[in-house]
Amino acid sequence: MAYNKTNISFGLAVLLIAVVTNCTGCKKRTTINVPRAILQARSATLDELLHIVNRLDGIRTLKASNIKAEYTSEKKEGSLIELEKYPRAPGYIMLKRPDSLRLVIQNPVIKKSELTLVSVGDEFRVWVHGRHKFYIGKNSSEELISDDLEEDTEIPIRAGHIFEAVFPESIPLNDPDIRFTKIEEEDAYAKYYVITVYRNGPSARILPLREFRIERSGLTISRQRIFNDDGQVVSDIHYSDPEQIDKYTLPGKINIERPLDGYTLELEIKDWVVNSVFKDDTFSLEPVEGIKVIRFK
């Protein structure tokens, strides 16, 4: 009888593998736990996703009397990176459209105000209570310069950074110069829709403005990225612990990364209150007698 040498060699190879692995035709099964967020991913149209981004337009004011803030600054010197982390501190926050904010940070032990930040329009005012100093400047300033040469003018944080994180700018649906795209993404934890907003630029260019990542099991915004005209990320904002307040979904945690400004601000927020009425002087802040006032150009 004639035998095919190839078949004999293949059969011997299979037998050898079975002996070495001490397995005679058995199969190894592995169980993988798929995260619930992936299993429960929902579908949404582009119009529905745009509504999710824009639905916060119905909120005129927001406040939270129970927040915790943690600030980390980053300084680069050559190949070295120096991180300075400030302890988590309690406080409260109040916001009013279109551009008013009041943020108070308190001493963690005695709950006395340590820092008060008020911003209306382009002007911000900061009162550092313990240092008896009062700063006045512009949110639009890339660099804060003071005539007082003794002052450290490195104040990278701006009220606008916080405002745009809490109140994401809505997407203009009828602006002919605005374009937006929808794609799908997935990681080990969840599935996402990603909406990227562009603006028509010079010649054939389109310029990225903002990007929203929407987690599909809850259809909530989990991340927002904001770009400058060169396509660099100026704000990378992560949202988590969403909570339903009235008819709105609001985050319990907001992490603001400002890579070009060299700082990160993490906010843990409880007890959101929607559309309350504020006093007329809520967003006013004047220096008290005897305090040193530093004005930035």
What is the predicted function of each stretch?
Residues L62-N66, Y86-R88, P98, I105, ...:
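Extended beta-sheet lipid-handling architectures
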Residues P98-H161:
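An acidic-aromatic
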Residues I67-E74, P108-I110, H129, I183, ...:
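Hydrophobic lipid-interacting interfaces of membrane-associated proteins
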Residues A64, L103-V104, F124, I162, ...:
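Buried hydrophobic packing residues in well-ordered domains
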Residues L50-N54, P90-L95, L117, I237-Q244:
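Extended lipid/amphipathic-ligand handling interfaces
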Residues M1-C26:
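Sec-dependent bacterial lipoprotein signal peptides
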Residues G25-P87, S100, E150, P156, ...:
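N-terminal leader/targeting segments and the immediate start of mature chains
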Residues C26-K28, I171, P176-G290, I294-F296:
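Gly/Pro-enriched, hydrophobic low-complexity segments
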